[in-house]
Swiss-Prot record:
Changing residue 415 to M: In strain: Isolate SAD1-3670 var 1 and Isolate SAD1-3670 var 2. Changing residue 352 to G: In strain: Isolate SAD VA1 and SRV9. The gene is G. Attaches the virus to host cellular receptor, inducing endocytosis of the virion by using different host proteins including TFRC, GRM2 and ITGB1. In the endosome, the acidic pH induces conformational changes in the glycoprotein trimer, which trigger fusion between virus and cell membrane. There is convincing in vitro evidence that the muscular form of the nicotinic acetylcholine receptor (nAChR), the neuronal cell adhesion molecule (NCAM), and the p75 neurotrophin receptor (p75NTR) bind glycoprotein and thereby facilitate rabies virus entry into cells. Changing residue 275 to Q: In strain: Isolate SAD Bern original var 1, Isolate SAD Bern original var 3, Isolate SAD Bern original var 4, Isolate SAD1-3670 var 1 and Isolate SAD1-3670 var 2. This is Glycoprotein.
Length: 524
């Protein structure tokens, strides 16, 4: 029952293209009333739209949309951001190496991004190694820069594929839309200049897998095709249908919002831009599940009410409300006038809000005007209350509307960092914060003494340094000893070098040096 009911859901949820659940159905055309017996009462068949009455049936094959596609086709993808990590080292005189890391961006190529994505998905260690910081090179008393390019893959990044023009829609795209994905160009630009978006499956056309093959019976009247009976046994009318391509496949959009790849000999016009197909998303599937349960419950209530009428031989306004047709199309309307059960042919339409049929107090709008009542009685259990307000039994229950509002408020989508409108990008090509979380931390590093020599070279250098230090110590000690020896000698010379004067016979005072000299000369 449920799989079949899913296929007539578009009949009930005809206004789903507008995003609202039809809370009621009411006749927009109402035929003349005629008296009937209670044995003529019947529960409506909500699985069939009684329409043109074509009788000539012939088998044919067609394609229709898979159950579950109503709003958008999800395309799994990923973003690829190019990052350049730069390591700048400086080695000072004594061998201390200071390393400073910086990150910038570059625009990656699609081929490189595809290879990096395949590495990541396959668990290839080359992807993780590509994200590591570069091993810095260094030279004594020089500044050396070492750079390394990395590709940061962030997934998933889901985009919506528009089946009408095969464009992609996501908030990660600059204008929310990407139309350039094709065989020759398999990527989209994003809000970030150095990030591109690519589909996980390089064959984007495979994402448009929304059709299923079915067999049915074409219904025609003479040479004119009126509609068809699908493989579930449901009749679909072609009245009001228009031509529409989905994912490049030509078909017909029916009045109930469904689509079939059916060709007719009639001259059918192309659909205007506002004529869309009811494409399902997960939220709509949940709502349709509730709709199916509600229809099954309503069917059981109708049968119970009909059984009660037949058993008790009495009819009430409340019981007549269960006999109302729940989907748009032709059906019956029932009422009680002057204690007489009445029936009329009716064509039902969907109602999205109560204001459509209750524009003012005491007015029930049918066919564009206020419908007259008979002693406060309308039809299908609708009556005029003592206070002058129109009372509709179904207005007392808004279960489905509450379910829909609950579903709408409970959707929490997964947001890609670039899809967040509050994201503020840095000026220039400095690395953004959203890629930093996917890369190792960078910070300044200062190494120990390292001159870049091999192990034997280090030992030779240490030995030469120790020998030089020893020679310097010996030299300093030798200098100190010489200084200490010269100081006592100078002190003794200063102690015996006092001036001595003598008085010669001539009475002239001469110095001792002159006296010694003249004495020597005398001796000579």
């Amino acid at each position: 029952m449920v799989p079949q009911a899913l296929l007539f859901v578009p009949l009930l949820v005809f206004p789903l293209c507008f995003g609202k659940f039809p809370i009621y159905t009411i006749p927009d055309k109402l035929g003349p009333w005629s008296p009937i017996d209670i044995h003529h009462l019947s529960c409506p068949n909500n699985l069939v739209v009684e329409d043109e009455g074509c009788t000539n049936l012939s088998g044919f094959s067609y394609m229709e949309l898979k159950v579950g596609y109503i709003l958008a086709i999800k395309v799994n993808g990923f973003t690829c951001t190019g990052v350049v990590t730069e390591a700048e080292t400086y080695t000072n005189f004594v061998g201390y190496v200071t390393t400073t890391f910086k990150r910038k961006h570059f625009r990656p190529t699609p081929d490189a991004c595809r290879a990096a994505y395949n590495w990541k998905m396959a668990g290839d260690p080359r992807y993780e190694e590509s994200l590591h910081n570069p091993y810095p090179d260094y030279r004594w008393l020089r500044t050396v820069k070492t750079t390394k390019e990395s590709l940061v893959i962030i997934s998933p990044s889901v985009a919506d594929l528009d089946p009408y023009d095969r464009s992609l829609h996501s908030r990660v795209f600059p204008s929310g839309k990407c139309s350039g994905v094709a065989v020759s160009s398999t990527y989209c630009s994003t809000n970030h200049d150095y990030t591109i978006w690519m589909p996980e499956n390089p064959r984007l056309g495979m994402s448009c897998d929304i059709f299923t093959n079915s067999r049915g019976k074409r219904a025609s009247k003479g040479s004119e095709t009126c509609g068809f009976v699908d493989e579930r046994g449901l009749y679909k009318s072609l009245k009001g249908a228009c031509k529409l391509k989905l994912c490049g496949v030509l078909g017909l959009r029916l009045m109930d919002g469904t689509w079939v790849s059916m060709q007719t000999s009639n001259e059918t016009k192309w659909c205007p831009p506002d004529k869309l197909v009811n494409l399902h998303d997960f939220r709509s599937d949940e709502i349709e599940h509730l709709v199916v349960e509600e229809l099954v419950r309503k069917r059981e209530e109708c049968l119970d009410a009909l059984e009660s009428i037949m058993t008790t031989k009495s009819v009430s306004f409340r019981r007549l409300s269960h006999l109302r047709k729940l989907v748009p199309g032709f059906g019956k309307a029932y009422t009680i006038f002057n204690k007489t059960l009445m029936e009329a042919d009716a064509h039902y339409k969907s109602v999205r809000t109560w204001n459509e049929i209750l524009p003012s107090k005491g007015c029930l709008r049918v066919g564009g005007r206020c419908h007259p009542h008979v002693n406060g009685v309308f039809f299908n259990g609708i009556i005029l209350g003592p206070d002058g307000n129109v009372l509709i039994p179904e207005m007392q229950s808004s279960l489905l509307q509450q379910h829909m509002e609950l579903l709408e408020s409970s959707v929490i989508p997964l947001v890609h960092p670039l899809a967040d409108p509050s994201t503020v990008f840095k000026d220039g090509d400095e690395a953004e914060d959203f890629v930093e979380v996917h890369l190792p931390d960078v910070h300044n590093q200062v190494s120990g003494v390292d001159l870049g020599l091999p192990n034997w070279g280090k030992y030779v250098l240490l030995s030469a340094g120790a020998l030089t230090a020893l020679m310097l110590i010996i030299f300093l000690m030798t200098c100190c000893r010489r200084v200490n020896r010269s100081e006592p000698t100078q002190h003794n010379l200063r102690g015996t070098g006092r001036e001595v004067s003598v008085t010669p016979q001539s009475g002239k005072i001469i110095s001792s040096w002159e006296s010694h000299k003249s004495g020597g000369e005398t001796r000579l």
